[in-house]
Amino acid sequence: MNSRLQEIRARQTLRRKLLAQQLGAESADSIGAVLNSKDEQREIAETRETSRASYDTSAAVSKRKLPEEGKADEEVVQECKDSVEPQKEEENLPYREEIYKDSSTFLKGTQSLNPHNDYCQHFVDTGHRPQNFIRDVGLADRFEEYPKLRELIRLKDELIAKSNTPPMYLQADLETFDLRELKSEFDVILLEPPLEEYFRETGIAANEKWWTWEDIMKLDIEGIAGSRAFVFLWCGSGEGLDFGRMCLRKWGFRRSEDICWIKTNKDNPGKTKTLDPKAIFQRTKEHCLMGIKGTVHRSTDGDFIHANVDIDLIITEEPEIGNIEKPVEIFHIIEHFCLGRRRLHLFGRDSTIRPGWLTVGPTLTNSNFNSETYASYFNTPNSPLTGCTEEIERLRPKTPPPKSDRGFGASRGGGRGGASAGRGERGRERNRGSFRGDRGNFRGRGGPHRGVFAPR
């Protein structure tokens, strides 16, 4: 009991210190001098009551009936003057603006250590976007508090660096170039088309031809994708979400994930973009749709995918106006997730050429691609895959085994989604996600109804 009391007191002391820092007080004991005291709050309440009473009095005078017969007009006039004089005195007083200094104004929950965490209001006041305050977003410090994940990322990066093919690139106009001339099938295809939306938001003239979604849909992606493959399509933040799904469907892929790029403005707060004519608010994120072709199971296809290694969010600083390049972190997400070595980047640039990838784009300044040389890197049966070590297999997140394989005691009782959830094959089918190769996209535990009874 004493330890619990000491813990509560320590939290209270820390909370008061943080409050003092936020409110500009000298110390935790001087918070009361900054906040409204009880006398000030009582004075504000009395002022409101006086104003309300004076308003009621003036309304009563305006609705007063005609004077009775025999009552002197001078008495009526004198009563009206007596009721109007207090109102004139209040009007002559200087206007006093109410300044709300109470710390509970923006308090979200009684256990909050930071009472002024209304980031939307902070954006209005300073121009700093709310996502600026998300911590540990960089690749270097993201897993500082998770040593196993940090070690897993290090081992995978070392293995990827050893198994990468030399960087290859080809300057080609994708409007007229036949992708089948690459003479190869690919496990991963990343598309970064220059959409009209990018140039419309920046408000500057395009230095390269922008593509419409009709042109993007005409690309022969289905002709160069392997029997099981993934496609990653950058589609902006507007109507591209719908058109991107249409492209995936036309190419024979199923949409399975949406990777969001959240843009911060720490270096240049308050920077505004040209507002899209179809938008009400300024958009500060972009979407990269991920599609899958073929059948990929997380539990059985560990030689081709490693799920749940990364998250589906990229949080980086927004590039300068006119720069439509995407964050380099998308390459790390793809390489950590898919173990296929045949990677193709369409609409690439000189700055995106990297080992392990074939980069094709109209803005490249040089070419070194040779179809025979590229095919020679994948002659042996297992050469299209990066492989896996015992340590990586031990550290990587895996799909939980079925309940029937966990032991005698673990299979007792039903799932959280109802009586039938978790029993036999039907229960496992209900617990299975909508995408078998998904990176953790489960609909919930025990079926679609999480912890409640199924609707009648």
Curated annotation (Swiss-Prot):
Pfam families attached to this UniProt entry: MT-A70
Site (Interaction with METTL3): Y146, D242, R245, R298
Location of the region described as Disordered in the Swiss-Prot/TrEMBL record: 43-74, 395-456
InterPro entries, per the entry: METTL14-like, MT-A70-like
Keyword Ligase: no
Biased composition (Gly residues): 410-421
Record GO terms (molecular function): mRNA binding; mRNA m(6)A methyltransferase activity
Keyword Ribosomal protein: no
Keywords from the named record: Differentiation, Nucleus, RNA-binding, Spermatogenesis
Residue ranges, compositional bias (Basic and acidic residues): 65-74, 423-441
UniProt region (Interaction with METTL3), positions on chain: 135-136, 237-238, 255-258, 278-287, 308-312
Location in or out of the cell: Nucleus
Gene Ontology terms: cellular component: nucleus; RNA N6-methyladenosine methyltransferase complex
Gene Ontology BP term (one): mRNA modification
Broad class of the protein's primary localization: nucleus
Binding partners and assembly: Heterodimer; heterodimerizes with mettl3 to form an antiparallel heterodimer that constitutes an active methyltransferase. Component of the WMM complex, a N6-methyltransferase complex composed of a catalytic subcomplex, named MAC, and of an associated subcomplex, named MACOM. The MAC subcomplex is composed of mettl3 and mettl14.
PANTHER family named in the record: N6-ADENOSINE-METHYLTRANSFERASE NON-CATALYTIC SUBUNIT
Family: Belongs to the MT-A70-like family.
Protein name: N(6)-adenosine-methyltransferase non-catalytic subunit METTL14
Lineage: Eukaryota, Metazoa, Chordata, Craniata, Vertebrata
